[in-house]
Every structure is written in C-alpha cells, then in structure tokens.
C-alpha cells in the first residue's frame, strides 16, 4: 500500500481552479471510491453497520476509537474484533480497505480536583433539580488521548497489527496530532494521516508536519470542535466551513510556493454539509472531498436515530457549549442545555474526559433529563429511517463536479 503515498502527494497547490477541481476525482481514484465523501467518525453514534454501509456505497467509512485504551491488554483485541466485523459486513476485499480509524489526540490532563468535582455537582443539582449522590459518580477518564499511548509506549501491539495484518487507508486524529515519528511510521507502511483543523494556524502547523489530509472543520459542524491551538473559546475565530476551506487552499498554495512544504495535503470540508448541493458547493470552492456527519444521524444504522424519529421544529437551534463534556461541542438546544448554560457562573470544572464520563453516568440514570444531542447546523433536514448506503447513493448521484 506504500504506493498510496506516491499517488496522494501531488503538486496541486498551484493548479488552476479547473485542475484543482479535478482533485475530487483524484481523491476518488487514489482511494478507490465512487464519491469524494468521508462518513464522519462520530463517537457514540457511528456503528460498524453504518461504516460498512458507507464503504459499500463508495465512500470512506470511519470507525471512532476514542473509547479504546491501548494501555489495557484487551483493547487491541477489541479493535481487531471491530475491524473483523466491519470486513465481514463489507464482504469485498477490493473495498474493505476504504476505512478511516479515528483517534482523539488531545493534551493529557490531570485528574480533577475536589473543588472541580464539587462545582460540577452543584451545577448539575441546580440544573436538573434531582439529587446527585457524589458517592455514585466516578470521575474516570472516559476518553484517553492517543498521546497517552505514545507517552507510555503502549502502541507496539497496534503498530504490529497494522504492519502484519489489516491496514486501513486512513488513520485520522481529532483535538490534535500525534508525534512526527508516529506520522512517519504510519505513512511508511502505506497509511494516510488526516488531522482536523479549525484555523489557519492549525493548518500551517499540520502542513509542516507533512500529513496527507486536513479536515477543515467549520464552526457549523456538529459534535466536538477539534481545535488544538486555541484553549479559550473566546480566542476561536469561529470560521465557517467555506471560509476555512478557502483560506486553507490559499495558505497551502503560499506555503508550497515559498518552499515551506514539499507536497500539498488533501483539503477536506467538514461542517454543515447535508446534501449533494452542499457537497457540490464545497468541491467548487476547491475542497478535494467532504466529511459528512450530521446528515447520517437519522439513518437506521445510527445510534442516535431515535432522537430523530420525530422531526424537530424549525425554531429548534443548536448551541456551542463546553460545560457538558469539557470541550466545545455543538449540540441541539434543549431545556437541559439551556438550564446548564444559565446556571453556570464560570466556576472551575473537571477537565475533558473526566467531566464527560461523569455526565454520561448522570445521563444513564436520568436519560429524559440529561440530553446532549450532538448535531450540526442544518440538523432540521436530517432524514429519518433511511439507510446509510441509500443516503450516500442519493447524495452522490446528484453531485455536480466541474459544472457537469
């Protein structure tokens, strides 16, 4: 699979617009795809069935792996089982490699302090008006960072599996990037590295690292925002998807012309992309492909499909909040979300991973009260009951590339 690197790393930065638009076809050809679409790796939502249907339909399938902890002996076996089930459902050796394994790569944080957990309990008791027994809440880190695996030398079995066994075409990272040595090793064995960016600063850093694809996550995107150079949401420029794509294309072209990078990574648009018109527009703005998430929330294979069995009113909106999980995330605005926002007074809360784990325990006990429905702008147009493959085929069949 090493040939993929040779095909992907093309000099596209100084192409004309027409030639640059051909990159969507190059993306498809290099990765053996029918459509320039990546099914987003939505933690807690994406299922193996969804990924398999996306792959069969001709898109890149994605499996979110933020729940795995390679420091534990059995978790590499969990990964192997997931991949095995995916391959069995795809049942086509020519397609099964069209897979993206996604990891969270945030900075390693300390365990929460007593003050942080006490503030959290006070906020939730006031917002939910229910008794919360702190003796029943465990502040465990439910989302271990890939950086922790690197730091503790816990990647040997994973790398061995990739080297000797199944190799996905893409491994991607959210909330940050792995070490240069990890990137180079994975590329050497023929795996493409994609990383999420939300700003031009992040794009510039990732391009210098030599990654293969930049997932440009616009502010309208649902789920957790993948920024890693901005710690305070007030410092986030909140670029829309199209503005981030345009500025990324320009930045990469300038870096290439100045000799700062030797090859230009693919530009992947992500955020607010709901149908073929949205996809066609992003491709016309020189994106090489798109990553679609919210549009699949109502699909029959989605773990979130029950939330979309009945249509939302047009008045229902989304909010970007960082006080549920500990990181900014776009969620559907519900009475619970509004109460938490109203009651929060800037108190210090537990860090991401620990706070999110505590919330999930409360949600399990009070599912009707603690609802955190991650979705992007345009979620009102989510189709309910459609299968993932049918959704992709419908979007793909109506695509317009180069005006055709």
Curated annotation (Swiss-Prot):
Lineage top rank: taxon: Eukaryota
MF annotations from Gene Ontology: nitronate monooxygenase activity
Ligand binding (substrate): 224
Required cofactor(s): FMN
Reactions catalysed: ethylnitronate + O2 = chemical entity + acetaldehyde + nitrite + H(+)
InterPro entries for the chain: Aldolase_TIM (IPR013785), NMO (IPR004136)
Keyword field contains RNA-binding: no
The record's free-text note on cofactor binding: Binds 1 FMN per subunit.
Chain sites annotated for binding FMN: 41-43, 270-272, 293-294
Enzyme Commission number(s) of this protein: 1.13.12.16
Compartmental location: Cytoplasm
GO cellular component, one term: cytoplasm
Active site residues according to the UniProt entry: 224
Keyword Calcium: no
Keyword annotations of the record: Cytoplasm, Flavoprotein, FMN, Monooxygenase, Oxidoreductase
Functional summary from the UniProt entry: Catalyzes the oxidation of alkyl nitronates to produce the corresponding carbonyl compounds and nitrites.
Other facts noted in the record for this chain: Present with 172 molecules/cell in log phase SD medium.
Family indicated by similarity: Belongs to the nitronate monooxygenase family. NMO class I subfamily.
PANTHER family, per database record: NITRONATE MONOOXYGENASE-RELATED
The name this protein goes by in its record: Putative nitronate monooxygenase
């Amino acid at each position: 699979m090493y040939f993929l690197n040779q095909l992907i790393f093309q000099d596209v930065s100084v192409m004309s617009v027409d030639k640059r638009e051909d990159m969507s076809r190059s993306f498809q050809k290099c990765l053996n795809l029918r459509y320039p679409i990546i099914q987003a790796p939505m933690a807690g939502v994406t299922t193996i069935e969804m990924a398999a249907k996306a792959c069969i339909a001709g898109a890149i399938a994605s499996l979110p792996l933020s729940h795995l902890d390679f420091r534990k002996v059995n978790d590499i076996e969990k990964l192997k089982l997931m991949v095995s089930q995916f391959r069995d459902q795809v049942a086509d050796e020519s397609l099964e490699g069209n897979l993206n394994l996604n990891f969270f790569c945030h900075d390693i944080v300390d365990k929460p302090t007593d003050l942080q957990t006490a503030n959290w309990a006070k906020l939730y008791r006031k917002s939910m008006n229910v008794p919360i027994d702190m003796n029943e809440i465990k502040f465990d880190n439910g989302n271990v960072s890939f950086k922790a695996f690197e730091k503790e030398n816990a990647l040997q079995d994973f790398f061995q599996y990739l080297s000797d066994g199944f190799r996905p075409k893409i491994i991607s990272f959210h909330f940050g990037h792995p070490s240069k040595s990890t990137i180079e090793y994975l590329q050497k064995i023929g795996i493409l590295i994609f990383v999420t960016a939300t700003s031009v600063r992040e794009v510039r850093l990732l391009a210098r690292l030599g990654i293969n694809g930049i997932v440009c996550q616009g502010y309208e995107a649902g789920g957790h925002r993948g920024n890693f150079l901005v710690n305070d949401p007030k410092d986030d420029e909140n670029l829309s998807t199209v503005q981030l794509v345009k500025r990324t294309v320009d930045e990469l072209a300038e870096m290439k012309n100045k000799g700062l990078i030797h090859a230009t990574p693919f530009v992947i648009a992500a955020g607010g992309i709901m149908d073929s018109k949205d996809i066609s527009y992003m491709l016309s703005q020189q994106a090489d492909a798109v990553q679609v998430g919210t549009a699949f929330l109502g699909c029959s294979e989605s773990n979130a499909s029950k939330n979309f069995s009945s249509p939302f009113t047009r008045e229902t909106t989304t909010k970007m909040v960082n006080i549920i999980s500990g990181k900014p995330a776009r969620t559907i605005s519900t009475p619970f979300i509004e109460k938490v926002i109203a009651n929060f007074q800037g108190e210090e809360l537990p860090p991401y991973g620990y706070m999110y784990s505590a919330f999930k325990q409360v949600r399990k006990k009070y599912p009707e009260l603690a609802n955190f429905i991650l979705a992007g702008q345009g979620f009102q147009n989510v189709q309910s009951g459609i299968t993932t493959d049918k959704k992709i085929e419908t979007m793909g069949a109506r695509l317009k590339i180069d005006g055709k």
